[in-house]
Amino acid sequence: FSNHTYDYIVCADVLEHLRKPERILDACRQLLSPTGQLLISVPNAGYCGLVAELMQGEFLYREEGLLDTTHLRFFTRRSLQRFLREHGWGIEALDTIQRELPESEFKARFDHLPPAVARYMLGTPDALVYQFIGVARPGLEACANP
């Protein structure tokens, strides 16, 4: 592959599967053109159903979903932004995919929470965010509130 020739590189559901995802970020930096963009998607470890499961003392890997057996790294909005910033990237845009609890693998766990706890959790900003989808650029300062 030639250096600095690609306008876009897509890492869709990739970073969470790697022991050292920063190595991919370094490689992408070398491959992107000066105006190139990295398109990423990662699951949200702060999804309220997953948090409910943790609150009940469980962390059950599954064949698919947020706790896919092949996931090695976990990100929340803040930890994703920090991870990218620490490795010389900024998020130009960040969007989300929402998943209602009845459609998730965590519904039963969430239903066992005390009502006040469930209401509090659902009131947090990324409670129903199942996945983050972002556009990042090397060296770009992160948006104030992507």
Regions found by a protein language model. Name each.
Residues F1-N3:
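Short conserved loop adjoining the S-adenosyl-L-methionine
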Residues Y6-Y8, R19-S33, Q37-N145:
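S-adenosyl-L-methionine-dependent methyltransferase catalytic module, highlighting the catalytic core
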Residues Y8-V14:
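A short beta-strand submotif of the Rossmann-like class I SAM-dependent methyltransferase core
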